[in-house]
Amino acid sequence: MKAPNLAKFRGRSPVLVDDIVSSGSTIRTALQILKVQKLGSPYCLAVHGLCTDRAARRIRDRTVSFLTTDTVANRDAGLVIAPLIAATLVAAAAKSSL
């Protein structure tokens, strides 16, 4: 993984967003790059948190906050989107049955 020179963002807190976090290796690599470039304390968000407790802990230890949606049950699932997905599926089913 490579990153451009982020010097103009030094001291600011970056927000990393990933669609799926499983082993956490991509996020951890990105966090290391941000640390080397002396950015502020990062926040991490993931749509689907499939990671093991160990992988999540390794991310949590390197960030201000690690947050995922509730599409997969996990300790970090703080963004509730299951009702939105359910409502969308019901609406789509009702529309297709007409």
Report each predicted region and the residues it spans.
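PRPP-associated nucleotide enzymes
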Residues: M1-L98
